[in-house]
Amino acid sequence: MTAYLNALGLICSLGDSREEVSRRLFAGDRSGMVFESGWVPERALPVGAVKSALPPIPPAVHLHRSRNNQLLLAAALQIEEDISQAITRFGAGRIGVIIGTSTSGIDEASESMAVWLRERTFPDDYDYRQQELGAPANFLAAWLQLSGPAYVISTACTSSSRALLSARRALDMGLCDAVLCGGVDSLCKLTLQGFSALEAMSPQLCNPFSSNRNGINIGEAAALFLMTREADSKHSIALLGAGASCDAHHISAPEPTGRGARDAMLQALRNARLEAEQIGYLNLHGTATQHNDAMESLAVQGVFSSGVPCSSTKPLSGHTLGAAGALEAAFCWLSLAPQNTEQALPPHLWDGEADPLLPALQWTHAGSRLTPENARYMMSNSFAFGGNNISLIIGDAP
């Protein structure tokens, strides 16, 4: 079944509107990546922080107060009119909410726990619903007064890719007529200190697929789609295919040959009834860790033997973890949107020092365009702990 991505709201370090994110994405503007101290002891790290003011949580749902939900609200307000029209057309009980996250309101919980440890009492404004993993979906459903299925998926870095896949299944099964789907994650000490303990954090701006790569940068973002069975009057961008695999190689390290990642990409192609040669652009998971980039290079070579224009957009946004799958699907959506009249593609930013141990890939740059020879089909990869792999294909529906 074709699942149309009719509306998109997003916010990340690149900006707080589709227009601003598009402009800075295609220009390769990484000024949103800033060095900040306080996240981990004794050093500053580059992070993809959202610096714009966030909307307050409405009083009627104030118990859901968290930065995570504020980011999600900022994205939802961008498509509020589309959501209202869907509610009017389908009814509140026929609209689902499926969101991916890995943090939820854990930063607010950490701050409240620190108060409890000092004073043996929680702050007056603390509520468990701030930190509950299902909070983002519960918050959106409560704010919009929706009564359709509402739940959160948390599979680390594939969370919001799985949310899009699950939303399409909900439409296909007749559980919903429309689904608000996407992902959200916010910067928090627990996450950054955890990746620092794994020695996976780069002290510099990340450098994916370079021989000098030395780890990730973390970011925060929210990306929210309105998915339905029918095309929007302005475009026909849709989720055409999805592939999922779980190779269960290791709790945190990817399977080194790329077998699981390759399986996910091949499944997505079969699901979309496309050949590898029809993909015009590939958004790589591209974390800039030694193991991910080596594995993903092998997997891409195994699927796209003739090459495919590709890039990692994490140097522009940071790795937004539970939001990354939806955010990078959104980057593909923006590449296909009618407003992208120049057919620009997201550039690959790195130092140009290719790793001689990795297969050579076909990198995009700031002047890259989706040429007439390239079909308007794009793939986006997300790979997570535990060998959890997702590939999505987004493009113009026939």
Residue ranges and their predicted role:
Residues M1-L5, R65-E81, I87-G91:
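N-terminal amphipathic, basic-rich helices that act as targeting or association modules
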Residues A7, L25, A76, V97, ...:
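Conserved small-residue
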Residues S13, T103, A156, T287-T289, ...:
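Glycine-rich phosphate/pyrophosphate-binding beta-alpha loops
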Residues L72-S84, G134-P136, A222, T257-R273, ...:
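Short, well-ordered amphipathic alpha-helical segments that serve as non-catalytic structural scaffolds
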Residues Q85-G96, M113-D125, A142-A150, D172-V179, ...:
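Structural signature of cysteine-dependent C-C bond-forming condensing enzymes
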